[in-house]
UniProtKB/Swiss-Prot annotation:
GO biological process: L-leucine biosynthetic process
Gene: leuC
GO molecular function, one term: 3-isopropylmalate dehydratase activity
The species this protein was found in: Nitrosomonas europaea (strain ATCC 19718 / CIP 103999 / KCTC 2705 / NBRC 14298)
CDD domains with a match to the protein in the record: IPMI
Complex formation: Heterodimer of LeuC and LeuD.
Top-level taxon in the UniProt lineage: Bacteria
Protein name: 3-isopropylmalate dehydratase large subunit
Lineage, broadest ranks: Bacteria, Pseudomonadati, Pseudomonadota, Betaproteobacteria, Nitrosomonadales
Protein family membership: Belongs to the aconitase/IPM isomerase family. LeuC type 1 subfamily.
Disulfide bonds listed in the record: none
Amino acid sequence: MKTLYDKLWSDHVVHAESDDPNGMVILYIDRHLVHEVTSPQAFESLKLAGRKPWRTGSILAVADHNVPTTDRSSGISDPVSRLQVETLDQNCEEFAITEFRMNDERQGIVHVIGPEQGATLPGMTVVCGDSHTSTHGAFACLAFGIGTSEVEHVLATQCLVARKSKTMLVRVEGDLPPGVTAKDIALAVIGEIGTAGGTGYAIEFAGSAIRSLSMEGRMTLCNMAIEAGARAGMVGADEVTIDYIKGRPFAPQGALWDQAVAYWRTLKSDEDAVFDRMVELKAVNIKPQVTWGTSPEMVTTVDGYVPDPADISDPTKRHDVEHALGYMGLKPKMPIQEITLDKVFIGSCTNSRIEDLRAAAEIVKGKRIAPNIRLAMVVPGSGLVKSMAEKEGLDKIFLSAGFEWREPGCSMCLAMNDDRLLPGERCASTSNRNFEGRQGPGGRTHLVSPAMAAAAAIAGHFVDVRSFIR
């Protein structure tokens, strides 16, 4: 009667404070992913205490937040960004930690390179000083983000003090309609339960629609679990999982592979498992989604309208909508497809994998971006994704359409590097957060799938991507 979360949790409890199932425990961590933003203070504290990382073989490091996505031959211009990247390089060199440096082809966004390298394996506990570590739960992992002090704890002890979450099952049954993607499922779920709906929970995604997703799609879904307030998101292991991992650099080989696969096939919730909460959606009812406000829960369908605060009875919610519309520069009851755009960003740890780029390229092939689009950019999630896309000719498709083809990194997902919105600019983005100022002070972000972003770039405004593929 165990859920997948229960199995992963119990397998990693080193010590329990009491018999209380909701009490604090010491949890063992299998894989520690590290980037340049949340690790410098952790390493510094470790050194001041005269300690060394306990198990360097569990760590994989990469710089992603601050790296430029344009020409890298002259290095990083911003002194703070440069210092963070150089500090990561120095710490990894000092402690013999595996790191993919800025000019290594394997460099990329930490939540792209972990699975890509086979460093994320079913049954693991995976942590990183980054909110969207939940991405790795797509591999039947218990994966979650941690703070800088916890990064130090894991470096020093390979363990964390933690409290068990409640469990939520999000079941999506049926076949997804053409033009509807994992990103649309994620936004539809968040629209249904809200950004606080998953608070205190670990979400497992299941159902025939989820099983039909590729690993890239499952990663997108689990990546967005944190935006529903959840501690973690996960999908049970199956043959899709196993096929994706096989042959990757960090994956087990030979007899160890056979042993691992036998174990991985057990990593799913039992048929009679009991969850604390269940949410059910029918795939056939899900349409392409577009956020209109300043929170991922402020979302509607592409054929929908901006809400009217006058129709909302709850005064707090009404105020939130009024404030969001003011910031976003939108009018009540405005059709989503009348929202014009300035920029388009295809990338981030949510949607920068090869499947995402293929979907966007399919839409823009043989077309040109609209005259009002000041910048449309594609930022692959890793050097290996970029190389694969170039071998398939996707870069030429994007360049011919008027897109910029960039180097891998977090890029315009957040205003921590040179890629950002100017005040008042409006962007269709495949990233995960549309908070005020997320992509730059005063920037206005609308979250969509890669295909929807590509279609918006061509039209100059939001348009139903389904009209492109019929």
